[in-house]
């Protein structure tokens, strides 16, 4: 099973590599074509797309969990297919409701929240309404993708994500070079959602066709709606806590200033998204093995070590070389205010990568209610941290608030998983100790050291993580049956 998860993870990483490369090339072109202010609006539009987990009311994730667990228990594929297509129809219907809501709210967002006026306001309003029109298509696509993940078709997903990533960034770049109007650029981004839907529905019809005369079980539909209902709470609060900072900053500062925060944030998430993408292969595997604690233990032990040996060197290198990387990629004037923001966010991104593991474990066991309740607990804490941080430290304070919130989230998720999963307690405790050690090393290298000593220790740590990764690969070769523990 661990080899299968590793294989799926590698395909996920391959697809994400293409997306990362396209994004790194596209953002400087968009900055040159649109300017910092319009680029800030474009990143806000990307933030709205990030709320797709809210728009689908948790049903795409529910499909992943239901399909994985049902097929793992030997359920009929025809019954599973009937449920899947029923839920995708519901998603498209919900999308129409969200379309109307965003269309109606767009003027308020532009004038009150973003505080835009004149030509910029007109362009942004057009772009937001174009984005609204794409929501039903986007939600149907997320349902199909969630099902394909439940079928563990990660190779197929990655192969098609590669050209779609080129389209997602390439089309807005072409439009920006022809006509630097942010409205049309966002409209081009929205158009790619329609293509996504057509692609994924065709693939799903090929792999899991709906058979005439077979209807979805009411119990299965009720389970999916219950799971998705609680998950929608997390999907409301989770993206809100991820993206609320940029919208709060947009209400206080001009778009050019917000870009000093949003561009480092998007850069950091993309630069470290490869290991996180690999971790997404863990969720359906955990759902499939929920009745076998020993298999879940091996999967989680491997995943915790993978987070450390893959994510830690990535965030460490980017943090140490943050200023020169930003200066070369964008320009020196942009790198100055953006560097401390990027370094703080990287700590949070490492912790967030680690938090994905207990989050996936709890949801794979059907406990989306627990993750939702934890997010409800964190929301007021984050609101206080964000307001206080921005008041005292500006955009750097927003980065600090986000990182502190992520640290709290990780601590609560690991504690909850430890409390709920008795067979996994020892492994989880060892994993938390390893993660705390990794955080301490990051803080020491980035903030306490400088000059040749900082560079030397960074090199040693990266080499150590690389050797550890090779050791893990050796242990998971065919014919090797050693159990990996943190």
Model-derived features with residue positions:
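Interfacial segments at transmembrane-helix termini and the short loops linking adjacent helices
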Residues: 106-130, 301, 318-350
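Interhelical loop/hinge segments that connect adjacent transmembrane helices in multipass membrane
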Residues: 1-5, 182-183, 198-242, 281, ...
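N-terminal membrane topogenesis motif
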Residues: 1-23, 78-89, 122-124, 152, ...
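Signature of the first transmembrane helix
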Residues: 4-69, 95, 99, 103, ...
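Hydrophobic alpha-helical transmembrane segments
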Residues: 129, 158-206, 227, 376-382, ...
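Membrane-interface junctions at transmembrane-helix termini in multi-pass inner-membrane proteins
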Residues: 135-161, 178, 183, 204, ...
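Helix-loop junctions and terminal segments of transmembrane helices
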Residues: 57-73, 149-150, 208-209, 264, ...
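Transmembrane alpha-helical segments of multi-pass transport proteins
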Residues: 126-129, 378, 427-483
């Amino acid at each position: 099973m661990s080899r299968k998860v590793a294989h799926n993870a590698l395909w996920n990483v391959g697809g994400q590599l293409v997306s990362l490369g396209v994004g790194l090339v596209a953002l400087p072109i968009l900055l040159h074509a649109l300017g910092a202010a319009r680029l800030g609006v474009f990143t806000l539009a990307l933030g709205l797309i990030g709320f797709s987990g809210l728009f689908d009311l948790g049903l795409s994730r529910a499909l992943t969990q239901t399909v994985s667990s049902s097929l793992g228990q030997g359920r009929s594929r025809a019954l599973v297919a009937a449920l899947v297509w029923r839920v995708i129809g519901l998603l498209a219907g919900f999308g129409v409701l969200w379309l109307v809501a965003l269309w109606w709210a767009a003027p308020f967002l532009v004038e009150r929240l973003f505080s835009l006026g004149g030509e910029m306001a007109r362009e942004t309003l057009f772009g937001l309404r174009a984005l609204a029109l794409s929501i039903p298509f986007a939600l149907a696509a997320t349902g199909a993708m969630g099902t394909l993940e439940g079928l563990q078709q990660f190779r197929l997903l990655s192969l098609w994500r590669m050209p779609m990533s080129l389209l997602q960034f390439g089309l807005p770049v072409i439009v920006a070079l022809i006509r630097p109007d942010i409205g049309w650029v966002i409209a081009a981004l929205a158009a790619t959602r329609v293509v996504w839907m057509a692609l994924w529905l065709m693939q799903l019809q090929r792999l899991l066709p709906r058979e005439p005369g077979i209807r979805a079980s009411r119990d299965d539909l009720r389970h999916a709606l219950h799971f998705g209902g609680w998950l929608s709470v997390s999907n409301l609060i989770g993206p809100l806590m991820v993206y609320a900072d940029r919208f709060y900053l947009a209400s206080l500062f001009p778009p050019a200033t917000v870009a000093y925060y949003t561009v480092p944030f998007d850069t950091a998430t993309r630069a470290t998204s490869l290991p996180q993408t690999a971790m997404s292969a863990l969720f359906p595997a955990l759902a499939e093995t929920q009745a076998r604690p020993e298999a879940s233990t091996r999967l989680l032990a491997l995943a915790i070590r993978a987070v450390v040996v893959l994510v830690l060197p990535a965030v460490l290198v980017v943090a140490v070389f943050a200023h020169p990387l930003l200066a070369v990629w964008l320009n020196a004037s942009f790198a100055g205010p953006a560097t401390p923001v990027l370094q703080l966010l990287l700590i949070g991104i490492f912790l967030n990568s680690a938090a994905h593991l207990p989050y996936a474990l709890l949801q794979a066991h059907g406990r989306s209610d627990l993750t939702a309740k934890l997010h409800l607990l964190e929301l007021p804490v984050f609101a206080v941290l964000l307001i206080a941080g921005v008041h005292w430290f500006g955009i750097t304070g927003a980065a600090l608030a986000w990182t502190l919130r992520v640290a709290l989230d990780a601590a609560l998720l690991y504690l909850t998983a430890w409390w709920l999963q008795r067979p996994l307690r020892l492994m989880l405790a060892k994993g938390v100790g390893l993660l705390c050690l990794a955080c301490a090393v990051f803080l020491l290298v980035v903030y306490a050291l400088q000059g040749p000593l900082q560079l030397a220790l960074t090199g040693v740590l990266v080499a150590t993580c690389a050797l550890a990764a090779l050791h893990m690969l050796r242990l998971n070769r065919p014919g090797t049956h050693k159990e990996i523990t943190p």
